């Protein structure tokens, strides 16, 4: 896959080019871009599959560039590589598939590049278009701070949310992350896709597999993607879960 690097710092461009060059299956396009205007021009002429994009640049910044790319039918995948970690929310709004904080590590870059396939790009671009009603609608991704920087998790990959004191654990297809968001706020935003099964747990409706009663009279909910593990359903939510399962 062809990769275009966009950064206003020459040393940063050189380092990213070196890291990409060490990975099989990727080719760094020349020339690279040092600002947003150059980036858009080179994207038009070079047709990259992936853009490694800095955020803070003179003129058009990286978020503005990505927003313009969202307007295209088949935009390249955008992976932000930035020294700033405070732009994660804006990043998923412009369909970024990765958000890496400098200094970028080779293994994190490799993982982000793997996610940047063309079907995912088209899908992400569609997800970030405003609803026809004109409302803002729920997020298509959830951002979480991890050891790799800021991770953007597609909502369709989320299996459950479980609250534990002031944090919420998000379980997704590739693992778990911690969120600093109230469970109630997540329920209010994503209630059409998730159902409450306990005062501290929300599960993805489409992941529900079966409800089972234990010999002690408790109820366990088995979810697709959990490899046989189950979550406890509180008695007050059993009837609602059963009704939902009849509708699925």
From Swiss-Prot:
Q: What name appears for this protein in its UniProt entry?
A: Positive alginate biosynthesis regulatory protein
Task: Tell me which Gene3D superfamilies the record gives.
Answer: 3.40.50.2300, LytTr DNA-binding domain (2.40.50.1020)
- Which pathway is recorded for this entry? Glycan biosynthesis; alginate biosynthesis [regulation]
Q: Which Pfam families match?
A: LytTR (PF04397), Response_reg (PF00072)
Q: PROSITE patterns attached here?
A: HTH_LYTTR, RESPONSE_REGULATORY
Where does the record place the modification 4-aspartylphosphate? 54
Keywords linked to the UniProt accession: Activator, Alginate biosynthesis, DNA-binding, Phosphoprotein, Transcription, Transcription regulation, Two-component regulatory system
**What GO terms describe the biological role, i.e. biological process, of this protein?**
alginic acid biosynthetic process; bacterial-type flagellum-dependent swarming motility; negative regulation of DNA-templated transcription; positive regulation of cell motility; positive regulation of DNA-templated transcription; positive regulation of single-species biofilm formation; regulation of DNA-templated transcription; regulation of response to reactive oxygen species
Response regulatory domain sequence ranges: 2-117
Q: Does the keyword Signal apply?
A: no
Q: What is the annotated role of this protein in its UniProt record?
A: Positive regulator of the algD gene, which codes for a GDP-mannose dehydrogenase, a key step enzyme in the alginate biosynthesis pathway.
MF annotations from Gene Ontology? DNA-binding transcription activator activity; DNA-binding transcription repressor activity; phosphorelay response regulator activity; sequence-specific DNA binding; transcription cis-regulatory region binding
Query: Cellular component per GO?
Result: cytosol; protein-DNA complex
Q: List the disulfide bonds.
A: none
Q: Where does the record place the HTH LytTR-type domain?
A: 142-247
């Amino acid at each position: 896959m062809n990769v275009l690097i966009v950064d206003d710092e020459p040393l940063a461009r050189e380092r990213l080019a070196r890291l990409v060059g060490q990975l099989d299956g990727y080719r760094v396009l020349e020339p690279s871009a040092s600002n947003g205007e150059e980036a858009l021009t080179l994207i038009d002429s070079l047709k990259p599959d992936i853009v490694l994009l800095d955020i803070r640049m003179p003129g058009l910044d990286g978020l503005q560039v990505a927003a313009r790319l969202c307007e295209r039918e088949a935009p390249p995948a955008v992976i932000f590589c930035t020294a700033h970690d405070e732009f994660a929310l804006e990043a998923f709004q412009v369909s970024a598939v990765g958000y890496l904080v400098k200094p970028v590590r080779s293994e994190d870059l490799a993982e982000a590049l793997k996610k940047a396939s063309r079907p995912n790009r088209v899908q992400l671009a569609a997800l970030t278009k405003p609803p026809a009603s004109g409302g803002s609608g729920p997020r298509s991704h959830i951002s979480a701070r991890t050891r790799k920087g800021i991770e953007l998790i597609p909502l369709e990959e989320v299996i459950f949310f479980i609250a534990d004191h002031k944090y919420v654990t998000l379980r997704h297809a590739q693992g778990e992350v911690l969120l600093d968001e109230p469970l109630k706020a997540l329920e209010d935003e994503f209630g059409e896709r998730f159902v409450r099964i306990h005062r501290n747990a929300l599960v993805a409706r489409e992941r529900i597999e079966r409800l089972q009663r234990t010999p002690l009279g408790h109820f366990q909910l088995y979810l697709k993607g959990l490899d046989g593990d189950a979550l406890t359903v509180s008695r007050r939510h059993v009837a609602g879960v059963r009704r939902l399962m009849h509708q699925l």
